[in-house]
Regions:
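C-terminal accessory subdomains/tails of enzymes that are appended
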Residues: 1-105
Length: 105
């Protein structure tokens, strides 16, 4: 269940806040561990774009979910656009636009 998975994820990655761990489980389910990988700190996840969105998560979305634009990720897939200001949304889009699309492994 979501609560148990959230608790386990937070235990495995103690730098995650309860909100962040829950968001990752709701967004990725058991694949959240793959998204976070070997991270020991939040800094290991790369740039923080706001609302707990990190470079590693965006990289995952580009390579595994074929995200091609910030709006696709922020509004259609996550609704996290509601939690970011305009500058943060533009930064997410610019980061995604720099990444060439890649097939899933």
């Amino acid at each position: 269940d979501v609560e148990k998975l959230t608790t386990k994820l937070a235990a495995d990655y103690p730098f995650l806040t309860p909100y962040w761990a829950g968001r990752m489980i709701r967004a990725y389910g058991t694949e959240a561990w793959e998204v976070l990988g070997d991270a020991k700190t939040a800094e290991n996840l790369g740039q923080n774009f706001g609302a707990t969105i990190t470079a590693r998560e965006l990289d995952w979305a580009v390579t595994r979910e074929w995200v091609r634009a910030g709006d696709d990720y922020l509004w259609r897939r996550t609704k996290l656009g509601l939690r970011l200001d305009d500058a943060q949304r533009k930064a997410v889009d610019a980061y995604i636009q720099e990444k060439p699309p890649q097939p899933a492994a």
